[in-house]
Amino acid sequence: MTILFLTMVISYFSCMKAAPMKEASVRGHGSLAYPGLRTHGTLESLTGPNAGSRGLTSLADTFEHVIEELLDEDQDIQPSEENKDADLYTSRVMLSSQVPLEPPLLFLLEEYKNYLDAANMSMRVRRHSDPARRGELSVCDSTSEWVTAAEKKTAVDMSGATVTVLEKVPVPKGQLKQYFYETKCNPKGYTKEGCRGIDKRHWNSQCRTTQSYVRALTMDNKKRVGWRFIRIDTSCVCTLTIKRGR
């Protein structure tokens, strides 16, 4: 399992060909920025003759360092008072020259962590903790896929303004496409008429797609280009309302 996981990580970084996000003390629109690109500017300034001189840092020194960083359970990130939506930030954006073949790396790391936790259990406990053996089903059916900026076209940023999502991001050796890993309720699933396992005699239920903020290269109505937090579909949740008159 460990060898399989490392193989997936290597293939993941091989197709990504993009720089990671780094900490930046930017107020208002969050604290993450892609290195080598200015936070704000015009589209011409990003694709001009000097664009190639802004070198991008390497992805990571070693794969072990990346895994250790992302799986660090002792790292407790608290949202600031100025930005109370910090718990909605996700890592569902990738810059790549081709459609990613795997879910975001953090999803794979979470699965690997669950595997390590299960490896420490006894065989009997492991059998009983398997969701398939317990007959567990999701309350709402969902579907996840990578979508491009060309499919999204526009999005809503943190200030409530509608911005244009740029399809390509300029880098020293050309351009990379922006991909977004979106999760939404499955319209063809068995829960399109209501949530699974809900007592319909007492409750009205509905599976509803919810959104979170991700960082993306966008352009506002004044043609200003910059990295902003926008909303994308990230989950499918069950909403309940009690039936009246009972």
Swiss-Prot record:
Disulfide bonds join 140-207, 185-236, 195-238. One of its GO terms (cellular component) is dendrite. Residues 19-127 form a propeptide. Pfam families: NGF. The keyword Signal applies. Its main location: secreted. Keywords: Cleavage on pair of basic residues, Disulfide bond, Glycoprotein, Growth factor, Secreted, Signal. SMART domains: NGF. It is found in: Secreted. One of its GO terms (biological process) is nerve growth factor signaling pathway. Gene3D superfamilies: Cystine-knot cytokines. InterPro entries: Brain-der_neurotrophic_factor, Cystine-knot_cytokine, Nerve_growth_factor-like, Nerve_growth_factor-rel, Nerve_growth_factor_CS. One of its GO terms (molecular function) is growth factor activity. Residues 1-18 form the signal peptide. Glycans are attached at residue 120. Belongs to the NGF-beta family. Important signaling molecule that activates signaling cascades downstream of NTRK2. During development, promotes the survival and differentiation of selected neuronal populations of the peripheral and central nervous systems. Participates in axonal growth, pathfinding and in the modulation of dendritic growth and morphology. Major regulator of synaptic transmission and plasticity at adult synapses in many regions of the CNS. This is Neurotrophic factor BDNF precursor form. The lineage of its organism: Eukaryota, Metazoa, Chordata, Craniata, Vertebrata.
